[in-house]
């Protein structure tokens, strides 16, 4: 009998949510996603030391200013790890823009273009890269501009339907709605500590977004992310893509049985609503206290880990 990871792959594109090259070799995903926290974790792996050394040497050659060297080395390290991962996957790597730029459209566009140039200089074409941006209004506007210039984007830290709708209307390539962090919030702020997979608030959110996109003919890819258990993953079988951590990939690969399709495009197309204004976006997003909290919290956490990464690099300069 087949294992559940193999069965899931018949329904959904499986993406690895890690910067660990060993995990890529083991699970052979189509694509891979990284973020500042995963880059920080990957930087602790001894085999990656040469990638750090290369990034530092490159940064020293770019500027004599120490602060600029730290920023340059951080960018180059993220790309170096991405380059190693791209050797092992047929698809795309997602590399994230500094979370501290999440409310600055111009700076986000500039950082995205810098990351793309580093990949291009290493011989990697744009069709193998996704630029990750937080799903703030400013991040979505940055993505809209980048998409028009042939730079595909992955909009992350997505918790509200308003964020999902704004991303679709901006024509972004892919969104990453966070399943597990939605569940975390409801466990911490509600009277319920356990949810069946079909009743999981994160699963319900992604299902709603997926159905809305398909019903309105949006081409933006829906990639469920941030899973807490295999039940959430199986309940979203059929979603365009799912990005899964190595421990959960392992659990799926060690479980036998066929995975049942839960999400499907029914082929029904409805008229799209008028495009959201900035005021409508903020008002609708603000109606969801979970989304407001988790977006801000996610940006803060990624910014903290970016700072830790820069401190580590600074100590080596």
UniProtKB/Swiss-Prot annotation:
Domain of life where this protein originates: Bacteria
E.C. numbers: 2.2.1.2
Keyword Lipid biosynthesis: no
Database matches in InterPro entries: Aldolase_TIM (IPR013785), TAL/FSA (IPR001585), Transaldolase_1 (IPR004730), Transaldolase_AS (IPR018225)
Catalytic activity: D-sedoheptulose 7-phosphate + D-glyceraldehyde 3-phosphate = D-erythrose 4-phosphate + beta-D-fructose 6-phosphate
UniProt xrefs under Pfam families: TAL_FSA (PF00923)
Active site annotation, chain numbering: 132
GO cellular component: cytosol
Keyword Cytoplasm: yes
Pathway(s) per entry: Carbohydrate degradation; pentose phosphate pathway; D-glyceraldehyde 3-phosphate and beta-D-fructose 6-phosphate from D-ribose 5-phosphate and D-xylulose 5-phosphate (non-oxidative stage): step 2/3
GO terms for MF: transaldolase activity
One example of a Gene Ontology biological process annotation: pentose-phosphate shunt
Keyword terms: Cytoplasm, Pentose shunt, Schiff base, Transferase
Record localization: Cytoplasm
Main location: cytoplasm
UniProt similarity note: Belongs to the transaldolase family. Type 1 subfamily.
Function: Transaldolase is important for the balance of metabolites in the pentose-phosphate pathway.
Known partners and oligomeric status: Homodimer.
HAMAP family: Transaldolase_1
Protein name as it appears in the record: Transaldolase
Lineage: Bacteria, Pseudomonadati, Pseudomonadota, Gammaproteobacteria, Enterobacterales
Gene name for this UniProt entry: tal
């Amino acid at each position: 009998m087949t294992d559940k990871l193999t069965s899931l792959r018949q329904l959904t594109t499986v993406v690895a949510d890690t910067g660990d090259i060993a995990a890529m070799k083991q699970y052979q995903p189509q694509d891979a996603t990284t973020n500042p926290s995963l880059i920080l974790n990957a930087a602790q792996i001894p085999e990656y030391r040469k990638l750090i050394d290369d990034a530092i040497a490159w940064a020293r050659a770019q500027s004599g200013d120490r602060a600029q060297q730290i920023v340059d080395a951080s960018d180059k390290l993220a790309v170096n790890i991405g380059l190693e991962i791209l050797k092992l996957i047929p698809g795309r790597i997602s590399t994230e823009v500094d979370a501290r730029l999440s409310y600055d459209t111009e700076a986000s566009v500039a950082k995205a273009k810098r990351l793309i140039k580093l990949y291009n200089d290493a011989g990697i074409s744009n069709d193998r890269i996704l630029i990750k941006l937080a799903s703030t209004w400013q991040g979505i506007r940055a993505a809209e501009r980048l998409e028009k210039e042939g730079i595909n984007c992955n909009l992350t830290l997505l918790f509200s339907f308003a964020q999902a709708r704004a991303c679709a209307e901006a024509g972004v390539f892919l969104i990453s709605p966070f399943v597990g962090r939605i569940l975390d919030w409801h466990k911490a702020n509600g009277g319920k500590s356990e949810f069946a997979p079909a009743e999981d608030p994160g699963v319900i959110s992604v299902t709603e977004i997926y159905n809305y996109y398909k019903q309105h003919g949006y081409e933006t890819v829906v990639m469920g992310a941030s899973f807490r258990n295999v039940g959430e993953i199986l309940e979203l079988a059929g979603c365009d893509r799912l990005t899964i951590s190595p421990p959960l990939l392992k659990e799926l690969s060690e479980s036998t049985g066929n995975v049942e399709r839960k999400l499907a495009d029914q082929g029904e197309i409805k008229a799209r609503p008028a495009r959201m204004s900035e005021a409508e976006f903020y008002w609708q997003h603000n109606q969801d206290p979970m989304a407001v909290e988790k977006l801000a919290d996610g940006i803060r956490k990624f910014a903290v880990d970016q700072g830790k990464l820069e401190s580590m690099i600074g100590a080596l300069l």
